[in-house]
């Protein structure tokens, strides 16, 4: 990459991601596992794919484009996110060309009240792909995480844009492929990566496998709603049957997780009876842990 190709407006220098200026060309000390656009297009022929080297956030970029045109069937990927976002305003850390930062646009014909389980459906799509890749100990965590043996490997952030009677879902997915120890320490919670779990596929191959599985899950959700996913979610849910605490702002409710409902809501058996919680600004933790 020539230095003049470096994106303007980013509070980031090439050296931050390991690039060095050698004779007027920005280079890496070791060749990174870059995403291959042609292979992505061949593996995902129904999608319009854009691979960006450095971007603020793939979700932010797609939201900007959604203001002017449809983003259905579009897939944005970034080698590096300078401002990746997670749920509840958190930052998603993503070193250059070592993890996956991607956003999928999907048209949803169901009305907004029926989309409560959407993040769970996406999580199950990712989890299914990981199991097919041979990863053991795959779990999901309500409402939007995928885990390996209790440690987070994938995060999901979904934003919705109204389109007539339906909407378009802007589905952001971050997947840890290869994490260094210092990066794990920065995350602030138990984190897993795919390489440590025995996955040898390239980032391009992983992207194709993950997105194919997510698209298949979305198609099933569009046709049948969330009811088809309840049993498998309960089976894979990290906290199913356990004593947990649900936090909503200053409110904290404890009880046993008994499952999820037909709109993806969490069902908690409490001392005062059954309570149901929807996603958004809600945190779920084991009863003896802190958020």
Language-model-detected regions and their locations in the chain:
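N-terminal lobe of the biotin/lipoate ligase/transferase fold
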Residues: 1-132
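Conserved active-site carboxylates
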Residues: 145
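Short loop/turn and capping residues at structural boundaries
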Residues: 22-23, 141, 181
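Short, basic and Ser/Thr-rich N-terminal targeting/leader segments
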Residues: 45, 70-72, 142, 151, ...
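Short loop/edge segments at beta-strand edges and connector loops
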Residues: 53, 140-142
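Long, positively charged amphipathic alpha-helical accessory segments at protein N-termini or as interdomain linkers
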Residues: 1-11, 15, 110-138, 148-291
